[in-house]
């Protein structure tokens, strides 16, 4: 584990991150292997990932990089970027009306810290074509909506969405139970399915009303997490595509609720939720 590293622990609905102020150099100051050690919940600090605050690129105020707890790199993270915005505010960097232009591997994302402490994020326009996700479940120029997929000895109907990172959304029909779902078993099978060449996040959802979804998530590179911001966005988009929900809904996750809206005019997806500091520290020599 890296020695004498100053860090700050934040969480968004229980999805927890180690934040590192990396503005002094354009590349992360840790290797993926060091991030894995730092994320270890018994021998390290413990987290779902390490987020680096980097100098801005391409006209953005700042840049964000994220190593998952397995050492892989995520293009974007909804809960993570809310935590980054709160971290910037706590550093005394106010932003423009609380908003920050953040360069990510998924493009520019704009989180805004509201007066009530919640963070609203313009997550951009979802990518719906198979070639954009990417997945081989359809031709590259086609959408993937309610496509059959064989996983774990049974057939699932899946809808694929990219929020800058790949998502596979499965709606449990009547009689299905999120509580009874063996997520530890089936999650890795979805993540590593050959239909997703870059692996995938997977959301298992129930629609409790036109404006209310429940969700459990298997995150690519992190496993079971209490919440996933991009996953909540992808689930709402998938619910609208499958005509199960309206384009604005509360998404309930094990760690709490997010408010998600898919604007029918601009096609942008907006996410609102909390981000809170947990503690700050320095690793030992």
UniProtKB/Swiss-Prot annotation:
Pfam families recorded: DAP_epimerase
Give an example GO molecular function.
diaminopimelate epimerase activity
Q: Which residues form the active site?
A: 77 (proton donor), 228 (proton acceptor)
What role does it play? Catalyzes the stereoinversion of LL-2,6-diaminopimelate (L,L-DAP) to meso-diaminopimelate (meso-DAP), a precursor of L-lysine and an essential component of the bacterial peptidoglycan.
Entries under PANTHER family matching the protein: DIAMINOPIMELATE EPIMERASE, DIAMINOPIMELATE EPIMERASE, CHLOROPLASTIC
Q: Which InterPro entries match?
A: DAP_epimerase_AS, DAP_epimerase_DapF
Protein localization: Cytoplasm
According to the record, the segments passing through the membrane are: none
Q: What is its EC number?
A: 5.1.1.7
State which pathway it belongs to. Answer: Amino-acid biosynthesis; L-lysine biosynthesis via DAP pathway; DL-2,6-diaminopimelate from LL-2,6-diaminopimelate: step 1/1
Q: Which cysteine pairs are covalently linked by disulfides here?
A: none
This protein's GO cellular component annotations are: cytosol
Q: Where does substrate bind?
A: 15, 68, 78-79, 165, 201, 219-220, 229-230
Listed under catalytic activity are: (2S,6S)-2,6-diaminopimelate = meso-2,6-diaminopimelate
User: In this UniProt entry, which residues are annotated as the site Could be important to modulate the pK values of the two catalytic cysteine residues?
Assistant: 167, 219
Lineage top rank: taxon: Bacteria
Q: Say which family it is in.
A: Belongs to the diaminopimelate epimerase family.
Which keywords annotate this record? Amino-acid biosynthesis, Cytoplasm, Isomerase, Lysine biosynthesis
| Chief localization | cytoplasm
How is this protein named in the record? Diaminopimelate epimerase
Native organism is Synechococcus sp. (strain JA-3-3Ab) (Cyanobacteria bacterium Yellowstone A-Prime)
* Subunit and interaction comment: Homodimer.
Asked if the keyword Isomerase belongs to this entry, the reply reads yes
GO annotation, biological process: lysine biosynthetic process via diaminopimelate
Q: Does the keyword Ion transport apply?
A: no
